[in-house]
């Protein structure tokens, strides 16, 4: 696992955007062989999305031959609801880049058969050849996507009940009213994320420090699902200084030293 420690949120967002753009460009994608990107929502990736939009406007990266699969979606929210992840992705990213609408895949939380929707999502990922780079955020409790503590580390796309902590955390997007937050969601599994060729996790702020410490220094456990990244051959966490507050001094210095040429 690589841990990239940047000074602040803006710096880590730019690093992540540059990394994603470099991977797309190196793949030289075509309509027949597109680059497949896994996309998160939430506040963590917003800076990266803004930086990627700028790189796209500057002609430094194109999304014409990029196919995306989003991590998750609430169950029961209309697609055009202001807090649906469909709305989030188009408003904050897709509307501002040269991606083709037919290349965007987001789980349908209003499907008649939710289990079939999840199975078909996995099938679509497999048929295109898997995900080249899965980007993700991390919750204060170490969850990735909606894989809450206790989730199977080999799990695939499925329906999940959200924990009280997550409902409270997400209520900030629903007028701070926990009763407005959907109680279930469709989410890719930990195994789905780990099946990607590369995984890039964004971790920022002191409130994520404990999760980062478990991800890097702790054992692999279902109670901190991000810890499963230790098993991935090409896992990267890019974080800011505040997120490193719980790391041992030796761990911090090790990653600062080994990655100094890449910062």
UniProtKB/Swiss-Prot annotation:
GO terms for molecular function: glucosamine-6-phosphate deaminase activity; identical protein binding. One of its GO terms (biological process) is N-acetylneuraminate catabolic process. The active site is at residues 72, 141, 143, 148. Keywords: Allosteric enzyme, Carbohydrate metabolism, Hydrolase. Transmembrane segments: none annotated. Allosterically activated by N-acetylglucosamine 6-phosphate (GlcNAc6P). Pathway: Amino-sugar metabolism; N-acetylneuraminate degradation; D-fructose 6-phosphate from N-acetylneuraminate: step 5/5. Its EC number is 3.5.99.6. SUPFAM superfamilies: NagB/RpiA/CoA transferase-like (SSF100950). CDD domains: GlcN6P_deaminase (cd01399). One of its GO terms (cellular component) is cytoplasm. The record marks 151, 158, 160-161, 254 as: Part of the allosteric site. It catalyses: alpha-D-glucosamine 6-phosphate + H2O = beta-D-fructose 6-phosphate + NH4(+). It comes from the Bacteria. InterPro entries: Glc/Gal-6P_isomerase, Glucosamine6P_isomerase, Glucosamine6P_isomerase_CS, NagB/RpiA_transferase-like. Catalyzes the reversible isomerization-deamination of glucosamine 6-phosphate (GlcN6P) to form fructose 6-phosphate (Fru6P) and ammonium ion. PANTHER family: GLUCOSAMINE-6-PHOSPHATE ISOMERASE. Belongs to the glucosamine/galactosamine-6-phosphate isomerase family. NagB subfamily. This is Glucosamine-6-phosphate deaminase. It comes from Phocaeicola vulgatus (strain ATCC 8482 / DSM 1447 / JCM 5826 / CCUG 4940 / NBRC 14291 / NCTC 11154). The gene is nagB.
């Amino acid at each position: 696992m690589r841990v990239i420690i940047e000074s602040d949120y803006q710096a880590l967002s730019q690093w992540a955007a540059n990394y994603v753009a470099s991977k797309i460009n190196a793949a030289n994608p075509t309509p027949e062989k597109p680059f497949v990107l896994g996309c998160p929502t939430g506040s963590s990736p917003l800076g990266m999305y803004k930086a990627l939009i700028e790189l796209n406007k500057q002609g430094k990266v194109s999304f014409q031959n990029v196919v995306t699969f989003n991590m998750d979606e609430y169950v029961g929210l209309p697609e055009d609801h202001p807090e649906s992840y469909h709305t989030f992705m188009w408003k904050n990213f897709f509307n501002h880049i040269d991606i083709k609408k037919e290349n965007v895949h987001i789980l349908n939380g209003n499907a008649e058969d939710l289990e079939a929707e999840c199975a078909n999502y996995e099938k679509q990922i497999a048929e295109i050849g898997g995900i080249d780079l899965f980007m993700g955020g991390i919750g204060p409790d170490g969850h990735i996507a909606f894989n809450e503590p206790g989730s199977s580390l080999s799990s695939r796309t499925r329906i999940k009940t959200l924990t009280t902590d997550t409902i409270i955390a997400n209520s900030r997007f629903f007028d701070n009213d926990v009763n407005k937050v959907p109680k279930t969601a469709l989410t890719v599994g930990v195994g789905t994320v780990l099946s990607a060729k590369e995984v890039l996790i964004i971790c920022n702020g002191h409130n994520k420090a404990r999760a980062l410490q478990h991800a890097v220094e702790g054992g692999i456990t279902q109670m901190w699902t991000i810890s499963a990244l230790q098993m991935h051959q090409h896992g990267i966490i890019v974080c800011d200084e505040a997120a490193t507050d719980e790391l041992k001094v030796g761990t911090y210095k090790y990653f600062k030293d080994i990655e100094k040429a890449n910062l």
